């Protein structure tokens, strides 16, 4: 919206200035022809007035322009066969055929085609192979550093996979929390039914592209009961890459970061029209012009605080700048996530659930538990012990956070090094910076890890984009830290523990 003003008057035979009524017409062919109908993209423009000797203010408003995206990933998504219908959405928890039976659930669902989708109101991976997966939220281990029964938004232990079957959990409405592509997911609905019903949404063929969204289920008091990550991508995440670590243990790693979106350039054509103001025999022409533009983003992904299930918004991949995101009203922003003191322990985890788009600003994170991302874990050392996926794991179906030792093969020593010959890989200094790490000692295949920086806990800002990489593992370090992969162009630390749980890092999941 931009202001404009009109001054329209005439002098009568006595030299007195009088208001002269005026009208406006439009031309989109540079004045060859004129019409009383304004162009469709000019959504508000006052086309007549009574006139006056002083300027009368008005506003001209244009519609949001849809850009042209020539990305091959967008083309692939648009050309994919649509799934589901408005009446029968494709059930994302049914990996067989999208039918009504809930088979396997997760906190993240991957969408690779336009269509109508749904998912049940289930805590994370609490359903597995059509049955209750109690090991996702209960362990026989006890102790002050062990969460024996994982909790929900009320602070009570989860007693049933289906949210509505837990005391004090009554779903009432579904709502978008944020999305990083305009209209990526639309028509979000809560549908009451057995076991609490489901959430459905639409991914339109016209607006589909790689992107991320978070959808929450709320009660009648507007409390978030749980939330889920929708990752739209054409990437076949099942094309895993086998990585052998320093201990000679093999892991099948997701080919890209969780929530990854590739480089993209969106262009916006110029829009213009002439406006002719006429009062009596006099006229004047002006041009309304919206200049052409292009928006470039580099590869990007959401960030995660250790032990937490919900993604925090990405950078734009170019610098320490946020990717544009959209709230439930469609309002765009590049602001940082809000931050808040979530306290610690059970209170912290409750707040993680209740406020999925707010960062814990206390450096220690939960400051309590060793098993948030591996339910039976009791130790603070990096190892190759099996990770038992929990309801707080952010990974999609079939994937989980990797164990602490997963990245040790990225150096010849299994540990920290600043000696280039001891780094098993080559640094990419192209527009998308990062390490192409060798997957084993044969050096015949690589896996790429972008230097995508981190999100700082105290103010939510992104930092170190294109210079450093940080990737969480499921392994805690002595409270309040966690084990993670760190690298720059000159150094690789596969077992770093110097940062705190509340910092937002990337996640590279491994296959279950």
Tell me the role of every PLM-derived stretch.
Residues 194-210:
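Extracellular/luminal low-complexity segments enriched in Ser/Thr/Pro
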Residues 1-187, 241-281:
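Solvent-exposed, low-complexity, repeat-rich "mucin-like" stalks and linkers
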Residues 344-346, 350-512:
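C-terminal, surface-exposed recognition/capping segments
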Residues 233-322, 364-365, 371-373:
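An acidic-aromatic substrate-binding cleft motif
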Residues 60-61, 69-75, 116-189, 290-387:
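Long, low-complexity, polar/charged, intrinsically disordered or flexibly structured peripheral segments
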Residues 188-192, 222-224:
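Mobile, glycine-rich extracellular loop/lid and propeptide segments
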Residues 209-220:
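A short beta-strand micro-motif common to beta-rich folds, especially ectodomain repeats
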Residues 221-227, 232:
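Short, exposed coil/turn segments at beta-strand boundaries within extracellular/luminal domains
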């Amino acid at each position: 919206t931009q202001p404009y003003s009109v001054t329209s008057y005439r002098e009568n035979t006595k030299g007195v200035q009088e208001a002269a009524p005026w009208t406006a017409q439009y031309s989109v062919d540079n004045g060859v022809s004129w019409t009383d109908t304004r162009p469709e993209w000019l959504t508000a423009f006052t086309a007549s007035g009574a006139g006056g000797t002083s300027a009368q203010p008005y506003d001209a408003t244009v519609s949001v322009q849809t850009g042209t995206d020539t990305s091959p990933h967008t083309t692939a998504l648009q050309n994919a066969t649509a799934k589901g219908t408005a009446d029968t959405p494709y059930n994302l928890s049914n990996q067989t055929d999208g039918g009504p039976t809930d088979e396997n659930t997760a906190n993240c669902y991957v969408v690779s085609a336009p269509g109508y989708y749904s998912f049940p109101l289930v805590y994370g991976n609490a359903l597995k192979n059509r049955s209750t997966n109690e090991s996702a939220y209960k362990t026989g281990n006890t102790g002050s550093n062990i969460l024996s029964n994982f909790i929900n938004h009320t602070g009570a232990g989860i007693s049933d996979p289906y949210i509505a079957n837990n005391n004090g959990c009554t779903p009432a409405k579904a709502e978008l929390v944020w999305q990083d592509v305009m209209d990526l997911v639309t028509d979000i609905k809560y549908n009451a039914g057995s076991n609490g019903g489901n959430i459905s949404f639409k991914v339109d063929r016209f607006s589909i592209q790689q992107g991320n969204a978070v959808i929450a289920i709320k009660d009648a008091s507007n409390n978030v009961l749980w939330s889920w990550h929708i990752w739209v991508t054409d990437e076949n995440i099942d094309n895993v890459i086998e990585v052998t670590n320093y201990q000679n243990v093999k892991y099948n790693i997701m080919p890209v970061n969780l929530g990854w979106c590739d480089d993209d350039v969106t262009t916006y054509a110029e829009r213009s029209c002439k406006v002719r103001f006429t009062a009596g025999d006099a006229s004047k022409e002006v041009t309304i012009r919206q200049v052409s533009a292009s928006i470039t983003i580099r590869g990007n992904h959401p960030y995660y605080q250790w032990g937490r299930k919900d993604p925090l918004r990405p950078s734009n991949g170019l610098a320490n700048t946020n990717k544009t995101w959209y709230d439930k009203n469609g309002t765009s922003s590049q602001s940082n996530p809000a931050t808040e003191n979530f306290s610690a322990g059970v209170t912290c985890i409750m707040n993680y659930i209740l406020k999925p788009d707010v960062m814990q600003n206390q450096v220690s994170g939960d400051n309590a538990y060793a098993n948030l991302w591996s339910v039976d874990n009791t130790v603070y050392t990096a190892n190759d012990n099996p990770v038992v996926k929990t309801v707080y794991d952010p990974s999609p179906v079939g994937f989980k956070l990797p164990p602490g030792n997963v990245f040790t093969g990225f150096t010849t020593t299994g540990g920290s090094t600043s000696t280039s010959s001891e780094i098993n890989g080559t640094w990419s200094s192209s527009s998308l910076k990062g390490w192409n790490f060798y997957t084993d000692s044969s050096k015949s295949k690589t896996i790429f890890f972008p230097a995508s920086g981190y999100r700082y806990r105290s103010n939510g800002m992104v930092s170190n984009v294109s210079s450093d990489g940080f990737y969480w593992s499921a392994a805690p370090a002595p409270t309040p830290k966690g084990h993670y992969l760190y690298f720059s162009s000159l150094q690789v630390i596969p077992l770093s523990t110097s940062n705190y749980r509340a910092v937002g890092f990337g996640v590279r999941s491994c296959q279950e």
